[in-house]
């Protein structure tokens, strides 16, 4: 059984499908995405395995890799991963919005929807999110989603072999 489908009326969080492969592969070649992520851009053929890997991650209880889709037409707008940590009761969220959907509040909506579900339905005590200190768009989206800034983690994040500072945020049940 797959993870639930969640919606706020504007966006939908759902499991990956094989039909999402081309959109995910295309978006992964975006220069801004490449600058922020270390992953090698997937080919559509290898990304088709993403649906199977997402289901395995959910079944293993290690995370929930959602596709963010437009509620009106189910078009993929980005990815949201709820990573369940080794610390029971804690999780982290990471979001990537496809270039054509940026600037429309998609990231903040997805972060809030995923965090609320984790806190309310999974009974998590804490959901964290982080952003590089120079990633103003991500910081704004996380704050707009209601996360509370906790501080700077020095040399915490690594991208392209370089360590850099990240801003740490969290949402706990009393924040809802």
Spans of features found by a protein language model:
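A short helix-loop-beta-strand connector motif used in the catalytic cores of GNAT acetyltransferases and
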Residues: 54-67
């Amino acid at each position: 059984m797959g993870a639930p489908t969640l919606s706020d009326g504007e966006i939908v969080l759902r499991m990956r499908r094989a039909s999402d492969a081309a959109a995910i592969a295309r978006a992964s070649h975006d220069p801004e995405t490449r600058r922020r992520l270390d992953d090698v851009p997937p080919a559509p053929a290898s990304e088709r395995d993403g649906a199977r890997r997402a289901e395995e991650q959910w079944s293993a209880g290690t995370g929930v890799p959602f596709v963010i889709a437009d509620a009106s037409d189910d078009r993929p707008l980005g990815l949201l991963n709820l990573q369940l940590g080794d610390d029971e009761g804690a999780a982290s969220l990471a979001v990537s919005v496809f270039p054509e959907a940026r600037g429309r509040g998609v990231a903040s909506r997805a972060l809030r929807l995923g965090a609320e579900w984790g806190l309310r339905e999974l009974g998590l005590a804490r959901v964290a999110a982080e952003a590089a200190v120079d990633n103003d768009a991500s910081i704004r989206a996380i704050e707009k989603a209601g996360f509370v800034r906790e501080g700077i983690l020095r040399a915490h994040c690594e991208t392209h072999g370089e360590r850099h500072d990240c801003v740490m945020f969290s949402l706990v049940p009393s924040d809802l």
